[in-house]
């Protein structure tokens, strides 16, 4: 896949993610978004009681014995807005401004930390041009305010 095509996919995934409200401690909608994304792409997916998501992509033929690679990104974002801006982080999407050089948000935080990490993981999970061993993507919750959902169970490889 060309670099431009890969960047287009990452940007597209990020812009879709920006439509889903995802403040810390309220990641239910973004968790469900990622769960359904995995189902649409035919990937194995699990959701735990903290709304964390684990998506597994099998190895490409001939790479089954290559060690698993794990990618991790957090779903939540810091939700702030400029004075005078009406913004409800529980319900409002991020209004992204794309000037073809940079991405910014219209009066609110952008959510690039770690939305771009989530988008990059989604790109890697859908790219069928690369040969790879098993891939696991872990999407955690509440990183911005305590990291109390993160558990080390994800680090245990089967």
List the predicted regions and their residue ranges:
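Acidic/His- and Gly-rich active-site-bordering loop/insert found
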Residues: 2-101
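Generic structural signal for helix capping and beta-alpha/helix-loop junctions
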Residues: 55, 145-147
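Conserved strand-to-helix beginnings and helix N-cap segments that scaffold or border functional pockets
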Residues: 28, 149-150
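Conserved small/polar residues in nucleotide/adenosyl-binding loops
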Residues: 21, 153-158
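Active-site metal-coordination/substrate-binding segment of hydrolases
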Residues: 63-134, 139, 144, 151
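Intrinsically disordered, low-complexity boundary segments flanking structured domains
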Residues: 4, 151-152
């Amino acid at each position: 896949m060309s670099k431009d095509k890969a960047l287009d996919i990452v940007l597209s995934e990020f812009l879709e993610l920006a439509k889903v409200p995802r403040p810390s401690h309220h990641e239910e909608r973004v968790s469900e978004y990622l769960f359904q994304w995995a189902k649409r792409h035919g990937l194995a997916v699990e959701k735990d009681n903290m709304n964390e998501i684990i998506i597994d992509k099998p190895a490409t033929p001939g790479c089954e014995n290559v060690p698993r690679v794990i990618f991790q990104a957090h779903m939540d974002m810091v939700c702030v807005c400029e004075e005078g801006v009406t913004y409800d982080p529980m319900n409002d999407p991020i209004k992204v401004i794309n000037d073809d050089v940079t991405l910014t948000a219209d009066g609110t935080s952008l959510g690039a930390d770690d939305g771009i990490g989530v988008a990059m993981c989604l790109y890697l999970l859908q790219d069928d041009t690369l040969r790879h061993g098993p891939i696991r993507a872990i999407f955690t919750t509440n990183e911005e305010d305590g990291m109390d959902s993160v558990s080390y169970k994800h680090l245990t490889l089967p």
